[in-house]
């Protein structure tokens, strides 16, 4: 099973009593924070279970209200390997064998992977020929091409499910900004 997601509220409460250095030491991993969630679960592929995004009845529910961000609904996924894995890349998808499991029907079983850039704290992402595609800041990326991710980049799994990428420093700054 992949890493267990925590809620944004959990991190917000932790950040309240910490300096930036303490937070970054305690939470040393980059994160993916949910931006939107799927509302309609109809029209899934019978073979893979992936929700196919070719129907105008599909509804996107963007999380835009800060009160909704602070609720227990928003999930945060740490960008890290499962302890039992030997491969360095971080795999993301719907299947329980991934390092990060996104239980959303618009996400493919093996949707994308993150590659750590040697001697840096940066990552590249690669779409693994997903059914609905991967979008980086609204632009669809081609399967198997590497794309570097930066703080505040929006990753879309198809067009329905978005996550925002944060380094530990940027995540702390975002949390402190939510408190003010």
Question: For each predicted feature, which ranges?
Answer:
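Intrinsically disordered, low-complexity acidic Ser/Thr-rich regulatory segments
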Residues: 1-103, 168-180
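Short, well-ordered strand-loop elements centered on a beta-strand within folded domains, enriched
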Residues: 30-31, 120-128
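General beta-strand recognition
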Residues: 91, 101, 122-124, 156
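Short hydrophobic/aromatic patches on the structural cores and recognition surfaces of FHA
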Residues: 92, 111-115, 124-126, 130-135, ...
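Short, well-ordered turn and helix-capping elements at secondary-structure junctions
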Residues: 96-98, 111, 140, 145
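Short coil-to-beta-strand transition motifs
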Residues: 104-109
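C-terminal boundary/linker segments immediately following FHA domains
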Residues: 122, 135-180
